[in-house]
């Protein structure tokens, strides 16, 4: 029976946490590859749960996808590379079949009360009703995409809610939850037809100016395509209260 989560925990091994990726992580680009979102969230998990404190939170996550992330057994570990009471830099790595397939870094910052000066450039977006299914994702199918409940708003925002936990038996943290969704910006912002072009992202960099609340994450995004096979997707992330941050992805553009 398939585990109803993106990853199944298998224990620890010499400082590494070991997991098995389930078919719910499968990418639309190939049946043996993971979508970028689940491994990005798993790397975030390793950093988020390393010496956690209520006095700090993740402000930025930068994930580098070093190659195709396969299904099967994976290992993660994390370390603090810049300790500090107010600002910390944390790094994590993801290994599969004896090679590093992805790595990440995160800035953790001291939290304090700045509610009186809170502001953002982006206006809140309204979560549409259950009858608003996103037609865009009808072009895509995969284990990962099928694990999302998706709604499309008239203003172009795509709202997504993962229906599975990141790791079986665990409650997904807010930072992990955002990273379970942020990588879909590449698809949301696509300006090329996927049956004619591949637009693979090699990274996902996410800044969070506010801790997300609730289960739904809204994404607005747009790709820019250069003349030489390179592009970039820029996106804004929302919860039902308003904007929570921004995301950026580098793209490799190739004809199918």
Set out the residue ranges of the language-model regions:
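Terminal targeting signals and extreme-terminal segments of soluble enzymes
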Residues: 1-256
């Amino acid at each position: 029976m398939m585990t109803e989560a993106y990853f199944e925990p298998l224990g620890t091994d010499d400082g590494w946490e070991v997991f098995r990726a389930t078919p719910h992580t499968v990418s639309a680009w190939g049946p043996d590859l993971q979508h970028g979102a689940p491994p990005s969230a798993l790397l975030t998990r390793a950093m988020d749960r390393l010496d956690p404190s209520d006095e700090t939170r993740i402000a930025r996550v930068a994930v580098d996808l070093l190659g195709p992330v396969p299904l099967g057994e994976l290992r993660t570990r994390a370390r603090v590379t810049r300790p500090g009471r107010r600002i910390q830099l944390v790094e994590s790595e993801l290994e599969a079949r004896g090679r590093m397939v992805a790595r990440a870094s995160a800035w953790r910052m001291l939290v304090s009360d700045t509610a009186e000066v809170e502001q953002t450039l982006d206006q809140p977006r309204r979560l549409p009703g259950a009858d608003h299914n996103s037609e865009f994702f009808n072009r895509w199918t995969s284990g990962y995409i099928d694990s999302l409940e998706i709604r499309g708003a008239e203003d172009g925002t795509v709202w997504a809610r993962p229906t599975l936990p990141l790791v079986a038996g665990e409650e997904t943290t807010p930072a992990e939850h955002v990273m379970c969704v942020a990588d879909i910006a590449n698809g949301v912002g696509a300006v090329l037809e996927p049956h004619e072009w591949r637009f693979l992202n090699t990274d996902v960099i996410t800044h969070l100016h506010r801790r997300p609340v609730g289960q739904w994450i809204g994404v607005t995004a747009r790709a820019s395509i250069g003349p030489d096979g390179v592009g970039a997707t820029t996106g804004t992330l929302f919860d039902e209260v308003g904007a929570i941050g921004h995301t950026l992805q580098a793209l490799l553009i190739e004809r199918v």
